[in-house]
From Swiss-Prot:
Keywords: Chaperone. It comes from Azoarcus sp. (strain BH72). Residues 8-80 form the J domain. This is Co-chaperone protein HscB homolog. The keyword Chaperone applies. It comes from the Bacteria. It holds the Pfam family HSCB_C. Belongs to the HscB family. InterPro entries: HscB, HscB_C_sf, HscB_oligo_C, J_dom_sf. Signal peptide: none annotated. Co-chaperone involved in the maturation of iron-sulfur cluster-containing proteins. Seems to help targeting proteins to be folded toward HscA. The gene is hscB. GO terms for biological process: [2Fe-2S] cluster assembly; protein complex oligomerization; protein folding. Interacts with HscA and stimulates its ATPase activity.
Length: 177
């Protein structure tokens, strides 16, 4: 078994290069590849073969890690398309989005400060629904329209949303302990 370490992750797993993927097919492909390249299968071979199997296994695991999460999959698709999402340098967002984020954060802080677990859970549910809607827009931008600048902006938006979801989770955990 030889894996081309230069092929993209979608090709590695036999998946179409799209945002919308069959996640169960991805997992099945990952399990299949893991069975073929797992270092234990090469333990009796010379060191060079052991190192090669470790490289293959690392590549397979990294590919699975990137493709199984929608946000990292979107970032990877942008990278493959030659689009720099400028995640670290471009934090400019629309005033409407920033206002929305401030409102979300204020609501989370108020619920946390008041110890309102039910309110935090409701905020979490509403944010999860909002996240689904934004993901759907991202899928449309990447798969249907090929609008990479819009997709890059949506990726940056989703990073804010994901961070807020973690803040709600942390607040819930703090209140429940």
């Amino acid at each position: 078994m030889a894996i081309d370490l230069q092929q993209d992750y979608f090709s590695l797993f036999g998946m179409p290069r799209r945002f919308r993927i069959d996640e169960s097919a991805l997992e099945a492909a990952w399990h299949g590849l893991q069975g073929e390249v797992h270092p234990d299968r090469f333990a009796h071979l010379p060191d060079v073969e052991k190192r090669r199997s470790m490289q293959w296994a690392t590549r397979v695991n990294e590919g699975f890690r990137v493709l199984r999460k929608p946000l990292s999959r979107a970032q990877y698709l942008l990278e493959l398309a030659g689009v720099d999402a400028a995640i670290d340098t471009n934090t400019a967002m629309s005033p409407e989005f920033l206002m929305e984020q401030m409102e979300w954060r204020e609501a989370v802080e108020e619920a946390r400060a008041a110890g309102e677990v039910d309110e935090l859970e409701q905020l979490h549910l509403r944010l999860r629904q909002h996240s689904r809607e934004v993901h759907a827009g991202l899928a449309d931008a990447l798969d249907d329209a090929g609008d990479y600048p819009a997709a890059a902006e949506t990726v940056r938006r989703l990073m804010f949303i994901e961070k807020l979801q973690h803040e709600i989770d942390d607040a819930l955990e703090a209140l429940e302990n």
